[in-house]
Amino acid sequence: MTDASTRGPGTGRVAPEELRSHRWFGTDGLRSFSHRARTRQLGYLPEEHLGKPVVAVLNTWSDINPCHTHLRDRAQAVKRGVWQAGGFPLEFPVSTLSETFQKPTPMLYRNLLAMETEELLRSYPVDGAVLLGGCDKSTPALLMGAASVDLPTVFVPAGPMLPGHWRNEVLGSGTDMWKYWDERRAGTIGDCEMAELENGLARSPGHCMTMGTASTLTAAAEVLGVTLPGASSIPAVDSGHERMAAASGLRIVDLVMRQVTLSQILTPEAYEDAVATVLALGGSTNAVIHLIAMAGRSGVKLTLDDFDRIARTVPVLADLRPGGRYLMEDFHFAGGLPGFLGRLTNVLHLDRPTVAHDTLREQLDGAPVHNSAVIRERSDPLAGEGGVAVLRGNLCP
C-alpha cells in the first residue's frame, strides 16, 4: 500500500533551475556564493545538493513526548528515502505538543506550532516537506502551517502504540485510565492493581491506540490525501512503519519534481471526505475544531452545518474504542483506512488526487477488508448516522 512507485497528480517535471531552492544556491551572485560556502561548512559537497530538490524533514521528536520518541529514527528513514530518490534532505526540529505532559493544555500551543511550521518552510531554501507527528494537536498544527506555504508535502503519522494489557484485560490507553481510576476511587481495586496498570497501560512509543483525537486526526490526514495509503494505522513500532517513512521520503521527491502542492490535494472535496470519514469512524469530537481550522488555512470554508449535513448520510462502521470494542492495531490488520474507505465509496469524492495516486478511486481500488467485526458492512453498522451530532439552542451557545 505504500509503494513509492505509484503515480500521483501532476504532469511534467520541473528543471533544476525552476526549483525554489535554486534562488538560494544556483544563481551567479554573492548570496548564492555565500550559501554554497555555508553548505560546504555543513560538510556537503556541491554535487550532493546542487540542482537537487531540497526536502525539509520537520520532526516533532522529543524526550518529553512518548507519542513521538521513535520519530528520531523515522526521520532517518525519511531522509534515506529522499537521498535514494535523488533529493537533499534537511531535518528541522520543531515544537513537540505532548498531550500527556504539557499543561494546562497543548491546545494553547497548536497555533504556535502551526506558525513555526509555516515560517520555517517559508524562510528556508526548501522545495518540499515531510512532516512527522501524530499526538493530538501535532497533526493539525503541522498541516495548518504547511498549507499556508503550499509546497509539495507528505505527512508521516506517528502511529498508534501497542495495545495495553493487564491480567486478562486488553487496555485502551486513552480511555481505560479513567475507568480504573474511578474503580480505585470506588474501592474496587487497590494500590497493587494500580501499580500493575501503570506497567501495562502504555507499552511502546506511539499515540493512543483508541479512536481518540490522535487516531482520528491522522486518519483524517490520510483521507485528505497527504499520507501514503494505509499509513495512519500502522503501529508505531511495526517495521512497516519504518518502511512507510522511507517510502514517504521517496515520494516527496517525485511530488517536488512534478510540483504537486498541498493546495492541489487539500480541496473542498477532500475536506468533505475527511468529515465523512471521521463521522463513520465514530471519531473524536475534537476533529470539529481542528478540521475547521485546517480548512481555513487551505482557503476552504468548513462549518458545523457541514458536519451536521454529512452526519446524516454516513453510518458508523468502525467498531473501535471508546465507542466500540477494538483498538487501532485490530483496525490496521482488518484493512486499515483503505479497506474502511472502500465501504464508504458512495459518499466520497473519488476523482480527487492524493499524494500517492491520480485519484482516490485508484488508491482504493482492490483494498480488502479482512475482518468485518472491526470494519462493519454498511448493512450492519454500529449506528445509522455519523458519530457527531450538532446541537443548537440556549444550552448550546
Language-model features: where?
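Short, well-structured alpha-helical segments in soluble
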Residues: 112-124
